[in-house]
Amino acid sequence: MIQEFQIQNFFSIRERQTLSFLPTNDDKMRSQYLYEVAEGVELLKIGIVYGSNASGKTTLLDALAFFRRTMLYKPENKNMGMGYVPFLLDNHSRKEHSSMQMTFWLNREKYILSLEFDEKRIYEEMLMVYTSSRPTKLYSRSYQQETDHSEVTFGSKSGINKATQRAIAGNTTNNCTVMAAFGQSNAATSRLNAVAEYFYSGMRDTLSPRDSLTFNVKDELRHDKEDKKKRFLLQMLKASDFNITDLSLDESEESITPEMEKTIKSAPIPEEAKVEMLRRGTLKHDEILFQHTGDGGEYTLHERLESAGTHRFLGMSVVLYYVLHHNNFIPIDEVETSIHYELLSYFIKLFLANSEGSSQLLMTTHDINLLNEDYIRRDVVWFTDKSREGATQLKRLSSLGLHKTMNPYHAYKQGKLVDLPFLGSIYLDKED
């Protein structure tokens, strides 16, 4: 589980901003909201981020995705850039280093992984573990300007032999993290394996409002041999009053014609996929069929006839299945996209009531109705706000001094929590 994430000098973020899943001493629904990662240490399972347009909500999720990506993937060549921009709205930030640091827990041990970089290279990287009250270094790297290379050193507790250490150090180019280089090595099992596995399968890609979740649903139905996930999805749809009684996946194949072969060869898809399609000589088609109860019986509708809201909630139900059955961290941007507020609230309640593991959800949203709900703890709510210089500031509701008797929804509407977007006159000068 993630305890804390710090970001500095990344897109709209200039000064160091910290997102924390450490709870306050609020007693509200502790058993639903908190998970014990070690004796005496509990972390929040959920985070909700509000903010006006262009205030930096998505930047926060992008920073997490960037951090995960740099820990997993080695650049194609050593001359590739880091793939980001620093804060650009002043004369000095673009010349300074950026930094990120994540504190997280695995197997009841606390890890701290930090990174300092710019657009061209990584300057510092360190991974520490707390097996006691004192930190132990697993590895560190530093950039040597004189020789233009990164020096990597491993701690005695890393569990990695000297030969593997040399191989990892040799693969750690200036634009590649030690973790990504480790992922390319044939190393024996160590604590680094657990860290790499967390970034690979524990943290998931951000779900954006542009993502079609229908592909996820089809993939789950295709591999659902015992219909467990299908029953879960139908249970969700029934409870949400969608009038859908069954789901099925209609699959078919079509032979590739010479004209289709030309289209495939020029299509923006991976070469491996093109080769496999042409080798097979057929294209696979699949479509979800929805069975509804109507006047006089059961009726089947093709997926293209279902609403965007139905598809989105079905996809969100797949997400819910995963966080309930696997220990995942899943970021969701604009979680309210295409679904009614009551369904959004129901989704959150379902997660809180049924989550027994260490899964976490981090959601951004524009829907302020959640601020009016009694079941939402104040320490899970965050706001992104812009300074006069255009820099994103991350503020926690529980730290804003709002009296416990005051409704956060009304305080937000009155501009007592963060600045609301300034809207000009509704009358336009039509002569311009």
Regions found by a protein language model. Give the residues of each.
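Conserved P-loop NTP-binding catalytic core
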Residues: 34-48, 52, 61-122
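Short alpha-helix of the ABC ATPase nucleotide-binding domain corresponding to the H-loop/switch region
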Residues: 340-345
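Conserved ABC ATPase signature
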Residues: 46-49, 263-321, 329, 335-339
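Conserved catalytic network of the ASCE P-loop NTPase/AAA+ motor domain
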Residues: 41-42, 93-95, 105-108, 321-324, ...
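Pre-Walker A-like glycine/lysine-rich segment at the N-terminus of P-loop NTPase domains
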Residues: 2-66, 432
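Conserved Walker B
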Residues: 10, 334-339, 368
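C-terminal lobe/lid and adjacent interdomain/linker elements of RecA-like ASCE P-loop ATPase modules
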Residues: 1-4, 346-432
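Electropositive, glycine-dotted interaction segments
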Residues: 112-258
